[in-house]
Structures are given as structure tokens and as C-alpha cells.
Amino acid sequence: DILIRKKEVLDMRCKKLGVLLAMVLVGVSAAPAWSVSAAEPQGLPQQVLDISNGSDEIYGPGAPIEHVENPDERFSSGGVDHTHQYIVSNALKILNNDKGSSVLNTKAAMICEYTDWPDVLGNETDYGTFAGHFYDPDTGKNWMGQKNPTARIRAETYYQSAVAAYKDGYTDKAMEYIGKGTHYVSDLNEPHHASNLTAVNSNHSDFEKYVDKHRTEYTIAGNSFGVDVYSSAENTAVGDMLYSAAKDAKALAGMAQNKDTYDSAGNQSVQNAIKTVSKYIYKFGKEVGIY
């Protein structure tokens, strides 16, 4: 009798275990759809993608091609109407394609808006001279002959500030800094900015208007970079990266001053800017653990 009762108890326990297992399996198969979608990567906002494809609907108020409010009314900054956000949005799109989704996607709008911030009169416009938006890699000076501020120094400073802020847990502040930094990265990829050619002594404004109008013709093949670009970003100091980019930009100064070669100069400048901004953001991401 004792053996029979033990067998009955064991059989009952096995049945209960089977029922529980069945419930678990049913629960897994009937898991709500949101439990799957919650794990899906966050894509870039549609507006960022639209800007990268040439939409004029940019984030924020933007910055005018010519700063008519400027007391001097002579200087024009490097990132104008749509060009800066076009460059940054393409960099973010490429990073998403090559490295996958990250917090940069959810903060993409902020980065895009802050890339225009330094061009808004009164923010970081150097009393209307925009001197700190220039950087000649051969002299290390801006158009006023000063070693500081320059586009290189500001891009480096914002990079370090972004790293420190992110590591301290201030994600939004870090994205603000990296956004502002990308402005100067783009500036020093523009031939006039890398040659200290202002709107007073050159065709600076005319060339930038041309580039802004034709920006959608200047793209990165496949919206992707090879591993060598990312390896270079990881293994090159920020300052050295910016110096090299400015050297390449300065080499295009002659072409950028000749209307017959505007298109070639614009194409190379914008492509180089997208690449350098991508490397700048990627290096930041690697240093703080985003990638």
C-alpha cells in the first residue's frame, strides 16, 4: 500500500509539472508584440533622414547664409542655411548604417540643431567677425592672426567637454557639446575657412551659396564607410584628425575661388566634411562606450 501511495503522489507531481511546463510554453508563444518591438533598435527620426536627402525643413531656426544682422555685414560663416545639418544628418545616417542603432539616434535632432548654434549671431560669432570659425593649418591661426580662438581649438574643446559630460551622466549636455563641435569640424573642411579667406577678401559667400544649393549632389557612395575610416578615427588624436582635414580643405582653395571648378571643390569639401564629422562622432562614441 505504501508503495502504491508513493507512486500515486509521484504521478500527481509529474502531472502538475507537465501542466506548469505547458503554461510556460504557451506564455512564451503568446508573448505580447510589444515585448519584441521593445528590443528593436531605435532608428533615426524621419526628419533627420529627410534632411540628409536634401529637405529644407531643418531643425531649429537655422542660420542665414549671409549674416545681415552682423554689424559689419561682411562676414559669412561656414555652415549656412542647410549645409551644416545636411552634413551632420548624413554622418549620423552612415554611422547608423555601419555601426547600428545607439543613443545617437534618439539624440539626433538635438545634434542637428546644435550644429547650427555657433552661427547664430551672439552665440559664438566673435563680435560679428566669426574669427573663431577659421583655421589655417599652416599657421595655426584664424583670419585675424590669432592662435585662439580657431575652428580647430573649438572642435577639440567641445569634443573633450562632450566626453566628460557623458562620462558624468549628463547625456543631453554631451550631445549639445558634440553637436556644437561638429559645426567647427564642418567649417575647417571648407576651403575658405581653412585658408583664412573671408567674405571681405574673397568669393567666400558666393561659393557657400553654390554649395548649399547643390548639396544633394554631394553624397557618400552607399552611405557607408570602410573599416579603414573607423580605424583611423580610433587611432588618430582629434587634433591631428582636424589638422589633416584642414590641410585637405586648404588644398582646394584655388578651385573654390574659380566658378568653373565650384562643383568639384564643393563635392570634395562636402564629402570630406561628412567623413570627418562621422569620424569625430564615432571617436566620441568609442571613447564613452556608445560603440
What are these regions (language model features)?
Residues 15-35:
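Sec-dependent N-terminal signal peptides of Gram-positive bacterial secreted proteins and lipoproteins
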Residues 7-9, 17, 41, 47:
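Intrinsic disorder/low-complexity segments enriched in polar/small residues
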Residues 10-13, 81:
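Short alpha-helical segments used as structural interaction elements across diverse proteins
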Residues 1-11:
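Short, Lys/Arg-enriched N-terminal segments with co-localized hydrophobic residues
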Residues 174-186:
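Short alpha-helix carrying the canonical HExxH Zn2+-binding catalytic motif
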Residues 34-176, 191-291:
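N-terminal, motif-rich segments that launch catalysis or mediate targeting to/interaction with membranes
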